[in-house]
Design a protein with these regions (language model features):
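Ordered, soluble secondary-structure elements with a strong preference for glycine-centered loop motifs
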Residues: 13, 17-20, 77-80, 200, ...
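Acidic carboxylate diad motif detector
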Residues: 52-166
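Positively charged, helix-rich recognition surfaces that bind polyanionic ligands
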Residues: 3, 148-151, 163-384
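Gly/serine-rich nucleotide phosphate-binding loop at the start of the catalytic core
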Residues: 1-79
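Well-ordered beta-strand positions in beta-sheet-rich domains
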Residues: 4-8, 137, 157, 187
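Stable alpha-helical structural segments in soluble proteins, enriched in small hydrophobic residues
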Residues: 33, 78, 82-93, 367-379, ...
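Long, hydrophobic, amphipathic alpha-helical segments used as structural scaffolds
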Residues: 34-41, 90, 94-101, 175
């Protein structure tokens, strides 16, 4: 089984320059590949695959344009992967899975430095450092997090990324499959919401982390820093003495706050999933939420986005598969909140403001807990 491990690294000043150059080259090549195929289409020529583009770039374009020879200074595997990502984006567009590929702008796009194991000396890992091709040994912040080479684990591939002035490495490692877990407990249903993050049918409720005092304080601070950044831009437009270096410093402050808030939410999701999986249920049932539709409501869009429902589903799916737990997904139109768990009657006039479910049979229960109980016993579902 292949598993990804992501942690922060502490590269030297020289390694940082190398990372910046490689990521910049990857972004340039990705944009160049999109622009070249766009030009071919406008001229009525055939689409150029990633392999043909690399041959054309190395044997035709670069010899005629020596000013772009700096492309060859970057790690070749990372550049190749950038072209492959461009081809994947085009394939998704051709298959009507996504929109037309967009160019990646400097500072606003998530571009990574890809690396792969070519020989036994590449991609070795020790407790406190990891060997990355073209960078050498790089120190790891969280010592012992990535399985080491001495323990028999092999890094197949990975990538280096940057976010808010911090550097991360993600390594793909082959680990042995876990033995079938003893799933002696009954299945559970999970209802996701905005008032509380998750309500489980076993009675456990996970609160909305966005309502905590810590996150509210950080969000207020973020508003102040964003206002300060906006004023600097306005002063620059008016021609007043605002240094561009100060704008970059303020922008980094805003990025770090965004990153910190995002990390708190992600950490809460990870801990919630770990606690749910530790109960060893025979199966877990969730509902197929229409998040994109919920985001269209201007009154709820911000609250929905901050809950990160999709990330919860993806990570729960991976953790369930790792522990041999069946993850069931109920139909999107299954009325889990409107069905009485006691008699099965559907209460069609239930409003979103009704937090207590009251049935004519005398059954009274919290709306979200009633939905979790219904999800636990749903008969029609898909296996995630």
């Amino acid at each position: 089984m292949l598993k990804s491990f992501r942690t922060e690294i502490h590269p030297t000043a020289e390694q940082k320059v190398r990372i910046h150059k490689t990521i910049g080259t990857c972004r340039f090549i990705y944009n160049f590949y999109l622009a070249h195929n766009k030009e071919l289409y406008q001229n009525g020529e055939k689409f150029m695959s990633s392999s043909k583009f690399r041959v054309w770039l190395n044997h035709e374009y670069l010899p005629q344009h020596p000013e772009y020879l700096w492309i060859k200074e970057a790690y070749s595997k990372a550049v190749t992967q950038a072209v492959n990502h461009g081809q994947t984006a085009f394939k998704k567009f051709f298959n009507h899975e996504s929109a037309f590929p967009k160019f990646k702008k400097k500072g606003r796009s998530d571009v990574k430095m890809y690396f792969v194991k070519n020989n036994p000396k590449d991609c070795r890992c020790e407790r406190h450092r990891v060997n990355i091709p073209s960078l050498g040994w790089v120190r790891i912040k969280e010592k012992g997090y990535i399985p080491t080479t001495k323990e028999g684990y092999i890094i197949k591939s990975g990538h280096v990324s940057m976010k808010a002035g911090r550097y991360y490495v993600s390594a793909l490692i082959e680990i042995p499959d876990n033995k079938t877990a003893d799933l002696s407990n009954e299945g559970i249903g999970i209802d996701l919401g905005l008032k509380d993050f998750a309500i489980v049918s076993n009675g456990k409720t996970y609160k909305n982390i966005n309502k905590s005092a810590r996150l509210k304080k950080l969000e207020k601070r973020l508003v102040r820093e964003q206002r300060c950044l906006s004023r600097k831009y306005e002063n620059l437009k008016k021609g007043e003495s605002t240094q561009r270096a100060n704008i970059q410093k303020q922008k980094l402050k805003v990025q770090k706050l965004h990153h910190k808030i995002d990390n708190i939410r992600t950490d809460y999701i990870n801990k919630t999933i770990a606690e749910i999986v530790k109960t060893k249920p025979s199966y877990i049932t969730i509902e197929d939420l229409n998040v994109s539709g919920m985001m269209k409501n201007k009154h709820l869009s911000r609250a929905v986005a901050s809950q990160k429902f999709y990330e919860f589903r993806i990570k729960l799916k991976a953790k369930s598969r790792e522990n041999g737990i069946e993850l069931r997904v109920a139909d999107r139109w299954y009325p889990s909140s409107k069905i009485c768990h006691c008699c099965g009657m559907i209460k069609k006039d239930l409003k979103l403001s009704d937090r207590i479910f009251r049935c004519h049979c005398g059954y009274v229960e919290d709306r979200d807990f009633n939905a979790a109980l219904n999800l636990r016993g749903v008969k029609t579902y898909k296996i995630a």
